[in-house]
Amino acid sequence: MKVSIVGITGYSGLELVKILNNHKKVELVSIHATKEVGRRLSDVYPYLAGVCDLKIEDFNAQEIIEKADLVFFATPSGVASSLAEEFVQADFPIIDLSGDHRLPADVYQEWYKKSPAKKMILNKFTYALSEYTDVKGKKFIANPGCYATATELALIPLVAAGLIETDSIIVDAKSGLTGAGKALSESSHFVNVHDNYMTYKLNHHQHIPEIVQTLQAFDADMPEIQFSTSLLPVNRGIMATVYCKLKKDVAVSDIASAFAKAYDDKPFVRVQENLPELHNVIGSNFTDIGFAYNEKTNVMTVISVIDNLLKGASGQAVQNLNLMQGWDETEGLHMTPSYL
């Protein structure tokens, strides 16, 4: 299968290159960006020498359609919404890593503060959390966000089984700096990040409606959640710490059983006896989940960790590609966590 990447110079686009280089069923045939056009990717990023020597091209939808069988959009929010229409009209498959096709138009505009994609285009897309969405044969995939992936995988088994008081959910989520993308900002300057820890977008992070929307598919009465996001002084990784109260007569063993039922046959979710750490998933497509119960407060704490650029973006995108095509779900994704 031949694929193209739009948004090659961003972190997620570069991670896609590395993954696809080891994918037995995929050939990367073109890469596109608005910067460094005409230069070889390996000249711009020497660590990719011998991995990808393709020249960066301007975006041209028709040329991509002629060369490839599918396109990945690894672009900032607000880009894919304006570029995807030509592909949809041509019935040409898309996996969009941005948030542009995850939410209804009015919700997207409220939370992203950008013009949404046309409703007829949005209706074509399937929001695809790999462990829960049947995407075989689908053509247009909205890849979940990084915070959303970690949080949803932690909560869905408990919400679906009716084990927790859904109005008690509080999520304290933390991300490494790459989660904010490559665009420079005050919060991304080294001197502001190093030896520092800060909360940002409190109550206003754009992944909040995505998480609630997904959980409501498992419990229609699911209310809003309290969700905070903070910036860790690390390069990559997300830790979502979820607090919730158990319903009456629910035992800790019921929680363990719910996670086992949900994930025992899922190759990229590991339910751990010990509490998860970022180092154990960095550089991989794994999600590690652990939990602990406080009998005095009746609060269950669930911790979910992922690599935001892999399971939270490019890794899950390739996982969805594999599932779309009916291939082995793990193809191209046999990355051992780097740990250090």
UniProtKB/Swiss-Prot annotation:
Keywords: Amino-acid biosynthesis, Arginine biosynthesis, Cytoplasm, NADP, Oxidoreductase. GO terms for molecular function: N-acetyl-gamma-glutamyl-phosphate reductase activity; NAD binding; NADP+ binding. Pathway: Amino-acid biosynthesis; L-arginine biosynthesis; N(2)-acetyl-L-ornithine from L-glutamate: step 3/4. The keyword Amino-acid biosynthesis applies. Gene3D superfamilies: Dihydrodipicolinate Reductase, domain 2, NAD(P)-binding Rossmann-like Domain. InterPro entries: AGPR_AS (IPR023013), AGPR_type-1 (IPR000706), NAD(P)-bd_dom_sf (IPR036291), NAGSA_dehydrogenase (IPR050085), Semialdehyde_DH_NAD-bd (IPR000534). GO terms for cellular component: cytoplasm. The active site is at C146. The keyword Oxidoreductase applies. PANTHER family: N-ACETYL-GAMMA-GLUTAMYL-PHOSPHATE REDUCTASE, CHLOROPLASTIC-RELATED, N-ACETYL-GAMMA-GLUTAMYL-PHOSPHATE REDUCTASE, CHLOROPLASTIC-RELATED-RELATED. Catalyzes the NADPH-dependent reduction of N-acetyl-5-glutamyl phosphate to yield N-acetyl-L-glutamate 5-semialdehyde. Belongs to the NAGSA dehydrogenase family. Type 1 subfamily. This is N-acetyl-gamma-glutamyl-phosphate reductase. The lineage of its organism: Bacteria, Bacillati, Bacillota, Bacilli, Lactobacillales. The gene is argC.
